[in-house]
C-alpha cells in the first residue's frame, strides 16, 4: 500500500 493510500484511508477514518 502506498503512503498516499494510507493517508487517504486515515483521513477518511478520521472524518468518520
Curated annotation (Swiss-Prot):
State which tissues express it: Nacreous layer of shell.
Report which superkingdom the organism of origin falls in: Eukaryota
Please report the name of this protein according to its UniProt entry. Uncharacterized protein IMPP14
Q: Which taxonomic lineage is given here? A: Eukaryota, Metazoa, Spiralia, Lophotrochozoa, Mollusca
